[in-house]
Amino acid sequence: ISACLEIRRKVFIDEQNVPKELEIDDYDRSNSECEHFLITDNGTNVGTFRLIYDKPKIAHMQRLCVLPEMRGKGFGYAAMSFLKEECKTRGNSKITLGAQCHAIPFYESCGFVCVSDVFLDAGIEHRTMEYVL
């Protein structure tokens, strides 16, 4: 998990100015309902995301990020493809996520749809999105 947290620090805390106390939460301190995934490229850590299983048959994806210098190379799309297959294998019927508004076109291109109005999370505009498996 330390490699995942280091990437999140670089992206969310350093780049996006999210306060550390909001970025690091109870899901990072306990693994009971949360699983962290590291995105790598030939042994180099390039991104991360986590899945939370706190509702039956629904996986909630959070904290997808790719290091700035590695963006635009398909790692986000690869992660979303893996995410869908992993959740399907686990018997989930739906994936939800809170997307930063600037990232909505990316998630829409992966088949997600917006299901909420805009809300603020850590001072950043988000919308809830879903993908039905």
Where are these regions (language model features)?
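Short amphipathic alpha-helix that is part of the acyltransferase structural core
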Residues: 1-26, 30-31, 36, 40-42
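Conserved beta-strand in the GNAT
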Residues: 38, 44-52, 60-65
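A conserved beta-turn-beta hairpin within the catalytic core of GNAT-like acetyltransferases
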Residues: 53-61, 71, 91, 121-126
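Conserved acetyl-CoA-binding loop-helix of GNAT-fold acetyltransferases
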Residues: 66, 72-85
